[in-house]
């Protein structure tokens, strides 16, 4: 019996929500698994996780008054061209870089703030 993944996906796309719910329940029973995410474990470690966060997203929240200086720093950080960097500054808030190490994130935040931007680390 050969399974055609595309046919299975097409059938799932056409199924109603009730049918999909029944499918999930049947899979859970057949294979002894659960589709629920482990929410309780993540909630218990939430405070510790925030303190021990090791990667950050750098979000430009406002370009500030010195847009030219900010655009130069944004170009340096992102490697984008002038037009793209200007677009990021003009359309703030925008994420400039994702998954940056804590030390590098602080360094880049300081550079941007020195140029006149308002920055948030998330």
Curated annotation (Swiss-Prot):
Pfam families linked to this entry: Ribosomal_L12, Ribosomal_L12_N
Key word Electron transport present: no
Annotated keywords: Ribonucleoprotein, Ribosomal protein
SUPFAM superfamilies, A to Z: ClpS-like, Ribosomal protein L7/12, oligomerisation (N-terminal) domain
InterPro entries: Ribosomal_bL12 (IPR000206), Ribosomal_bL12_C (IPR013823), Ribosomal_bL12_C/ClpS-like (IPR014719), Ribosomal_bL12_oligo (IPR008932), Ribosomal_bL12_oligo_N_sf (IPR036235)
Top-rank lineage group of the source organism: Bacteria
One GO BP annotation of this record: translation
Gene3D superfamilies for this protein: 3.30.1390.10, Single helix bin
GO cellular component, one term: cytosolic large ribosomal subunit
Entry's Gene Ontology molecular function annotations: mRNA binding; structural constituent of ribosome
Keyword Ribonucleoprotein: yes
Protein family per UniProt: Belongs to the bacterial ribosomal protein bL12 family.
Protein's job: Forms part of the ribosomal stalk which helps the ribosome interact with GTP-bound translation factors. Is thus essential for accurate translation.
Assembly, per entry: Homodimer. Part of the ribosomal stalk of the 50S ribosomal subunit. Forms a multimeric L10(L12)X complex, where L10 forms an elongated spine to which 2 to 4 L12 dimers bind in a sequential fashion. Binds GTP-bound translation factors.
Protein name: Large ribosomal subunit protein bL12
């Amino acid at each position: 019996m050969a399974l055609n993944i595309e046919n299975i996906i097409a059938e799932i796309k056409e199924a109603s929500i009730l049918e999909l719910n029944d499918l999930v329940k049947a899979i859970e029973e057949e294979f002894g698994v659960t589709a629920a995410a482990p929410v309780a474990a993540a909630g218990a470690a939430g405070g510790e996780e925030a303190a021990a966060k090791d990667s950050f997203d750098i979000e430009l929240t406002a370009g500030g008054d010195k847009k030219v200086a900010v655009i130069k720093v944004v170009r340096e950080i992102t490697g984008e061209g002038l037009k793209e960097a200007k677009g990021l500054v003009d359309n703030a808030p925008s994420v400039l870089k994702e998954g940056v190490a804590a030390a590098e994130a602080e360094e880049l935040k300081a550079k941007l703030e020195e140029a006149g931007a308002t920055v948030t680390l998330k």
